[in-house]
């Protein structure tokens, strides 16, 4: 049987005019800023806040295979299922980054019959938010280098500039560069480097801001580097926060699109969860809560990364409690964690599913530690067998875990009704949500709590550089920030080959980064990179554009 590609399905779908999608959730035309017929930005100042805001359902996953486990697909499909049940629902997603689109994963707008549209636009340039973020980030780099070139009144030590340039592409050759070469007219030579745009602090700030004023305040607090006597230098010292916020004045507005089934979707912001906080914008989530009774959103990778940061950073900053959490599992990921090689994942292997269930079990238990009841969604793939699925269901029943087989890729919203009904039962019950740690804990204790309670590790080792940074950060008054762990998504540990549910391992913190604008401290583990590289055969090799301007091979 031949299956249509995601792009073919998207191209065969009939989109509703964006003004009709907006009207379905009470967005007036004067609050809508259309970008063509099927996309728009929303003027949040023209949305009336609700007293009884919508309930937030978070979708996370077990530790993924390199291809991903369909978290975005389940997120969209679950929202469509609520729509099918006549619930007032919106879905809130992150924007895809071009780097992974051309790299290993292809597009990131869901899949099959559970997609947000227009898929081509969203995956490529969308409404220009990433370009604005990239421009603001690199404008700050230009302002820093110009300040040094023009006399360096602030006494910035060019050896201790923390701010890097960014690009929305996987490009390992740009990790370490020299700038200012070519003589005195070209600036002061120094070492620099590039991160991917989704790792930019500007991206994190946009996603954690509540208004333009809040955006400007957060930008002003960015630490760009240090003086020669090691005092922090901020954007406020450079006096360019207004200019940077101006570049972002449209990017801060949430983007409205739709699913194949016409469910309204806000797609806004896109930090990675392995190197940043991995959640869409607070503004999009809160706008959806003002418009809908249920908001389905996602956080990147597994509960150890995106979900932990959603709870400890985003929900804490926004001041809401998630009403339920869906943990996406796949038979292929369970088999991978049970020791099956990538080439054999399509073959039935119930014993491997049994061995790999420990990974899912830890993710389920992690969610319970935040005081929220998890619901497992088995995202169905065509190679799954009845015996494999039945084992997972029996495990769930034995352990009193809610579970539903989810077939939204093939059937759209109808394939997610069982999952939606399970989630509805959970959100109708009170929960006891609480973040994992108190902000008053010292930074090293917050990190240890995440490593021991969420990852299952036994010990944290800090490099000599990280130890010096801990001391310096305390002296600078940065000890009360939450922690954003930068770690491989493939394992609970910092070794991506250690699958399943390892325990007793040590995590090494090699370096810390102070994101004082966004308001968190990044702890870098293992060999994690903030500028990824492309694989030997990037997804770009399968992409093209027709003579009439339509994309080919975009997932």
UniProtKB/Swiss-Prot annotation:
The record's annotation in PROSITE patterns points to: FTHFS_1 (PS00721), FTHFS_2 (PS00722)
Q: What class of enzyme is it?
A: ligase
Q: Which UniProt keywords apply?
A: ATP-binding, Ligase, Nucleotide-binding, One-carbon metabolism
Catalysed reaction(s)?
A: (6S)-5,6,7,8-tetrahydrofolate + formate + ATP = (6R)-10-formyltetrahydrofolate + ADP + phosphate
Q: Which GO terms describe its biological process?
A: tetrahydrofolate interconversion
State its Enzyme Commission number(s).
6.3.4.3
Q: Does the keyword Ubl conjugation apply?
A: no
One family name in Pfam for this protein: FTHFS
Describe which pathway this protein belongs to, using the record's wording.
Answer: One-carbon metabolism; tetrahydrofolate interconversion
Which InterPro entries does UniProt cross-reference here?
Answer: Formate_THF_ligase (IPR000559), Formate_THF_ligase_CS (IPR020628), P-loop_NTPase (IPR027417)
In the record, the note on similarity to other proteins reads: Belongs to the formate--tetrahydrofolate ligase family.
Protein name as catalogued:
Formate--tetrahydrofolate ligase
- Source organism of the structure: Staphylococcus aureus (strain MSSA476)
Question: What high-level taxonomic lineage is stated for the organism?
Answer: Bacteria, Bacillati, Bacillota, Bacilli, Bacillales
> Gene name, please?
fhs
